[in-house]
């Protein structure tokens, strides 16, 4: 059986996993971004708006509410522990398969919700209902792969996720271009591409575990999860085995956090669905996808890796351990003192990792906050051949770049709190998050009425608090100066129809970027060395 993970191994595997996920995001997203740019130029705005906002919102609701809480609870269980492996593994398997019936029930409810609440303009779009049904089916298929995904994540098999999701994204991108641009199938084409994506996930994850079980039975050495699984039956639920109560409680606690996270990540789509035209939805979807590239490239993989690392880097105290310790207090004082010393060292090391990661993300986000607004118009005009020159898409993208700065801090800090908090702390956090989530929706609706699409991004910024881990003052000053100069250049120098003014605007941006990077190197060298030191652990 796989050996329990030490702190150094967890950090090593976590960092390697982060690099695999970041690599997957960069390669796949750049490829899909190029193809999607061609799709956007060739498809009607209304069709793209329905697909990118309404269909994706339906899929997100089904997937989030079905699997997010169970996924987070299961990743906190150590199925490689020698003493408790069998019980833990059975509980994780049984609980992970509950996502399927939950997802089917939610699919029926929310598909009908979208049909009854859609506008007359939307319902008149060709094959709207058929496309909606295809996205519902694809969501259920994706949930079918969830038990194997949870096992792969729990065992820190990041290579498997990188490979499977990479192939799935490539198939989805190629099929989208084929169905939409070549065959001109409209909304049905988006649905078919989504189903191919889900099928690839199912085949990939199940195929990996089935092949390894067959190899284990043939007495072949398997270093990935040595003899953790000996038969195919272990991958499926057993009604004779009960799910651990603590795991169920943890899942229920994370359910409230899933609702909050859904409101945070998809709240703007709810507001757009009820208040914007299909064309307005399309513009926001394009800007959102473009503006959140850094989030998908870098922030999201690091956030997911941190959620897997922190429970193992920071010692957690559960109710069972407390009860066992109370019964043996008089006999194990020396052991407890030693354990407390080890826990203190673990907390120091874990805290150092957290601080360095946060500082790095803040610096990256400041680059986008500083240079994004000044070059958003130019980027959109270059990518989409001036298709959105007469809209507010450029201003919207500029505000989205500022929003990215808030996202950088929120993701990792949220992963830390949710992965190491005790049960009573999670209960308190849940109620606070739910209240904040509904307040956020209220702000989103109000700002959307006042500022249209830009108001949605302003509401998002209010929902996320800044940390006190800010960079050096000179670095901040260089960012502020660059921000002012590039935006003045964008307003008074840049002209979309003038090649000369475009080149001058780009040159100003390059000069400002170089001077900002110079200050980062000079004033944040200590943080850079600490970050390098953490990265070097992956080779040890």
Swiss-Prot record:
| Region described as Disordered | 321-343
Give the pathway listed in the UniProt entry for this protein. Answer: Protein modification; protein glycosylation
Which one Pfam family would you cite for this protein?
Rft-1
Q: What is its main location?
A: endoplasmic reticulum
Superkingdom per UniProt: Eukaryota
What membrane topology is given?
A: Multi-pass membrane protein
Location within or outside the cell: Endoplasmic reticulum membrane
Q: Where are the transmembrane segments?
A: 15-35, 46-66, 95-115, 140-160, 166-188, 192-214, 282-302, 353-373, 393-413, 431-451, 466-486, 502-522
Which keywords annotate this record? Answer: Endoplasmic reticulum, Glycoprotein, Membrane, Transmembrane, Transmembrane helix
Q: Which GO terms describe its biological process?
A: dolichol-linked oligosaccharide biosynthetic process; glycolipid translocation; protein N-linked glycosylation
Q: Which residues are glycosylated?
A: 78, 94, 487
Q: Can you list the GO cellular component terms from the UniProt entry?
A: endoplasmic reticulum membrane
Instruction: Return the InterPro entries for the record.
Output: RFT1
- Its job: Intramembrane glycolipid transporter that operates in the biosynthetic pathway of dolichol-linked oligosaccharides, the glycan precursors employed in protein asparagine (N)-glycosylation. The sequential addition of sugars to dolichol pyrophosphate produces dolichol-linked oligosaccharides containing fourteen sugars, including two GlcNAcs, nine mannoses and three glucoses. Once assembled, the oligosaccharide is transferred from the lipid to nascent proteins by oligosaccharyltransferases.
Family to which the UniProt record says this protein belongs: Belongs to the RFT1 family.
- Report the protein name in the record: Man(5)GlcNAc(2)-PP-dolichol translocation protein RFT1
Q: Which organism is it from?
A: Dictyostelium discoideum (Social amoeba)
The gene name reads rft1
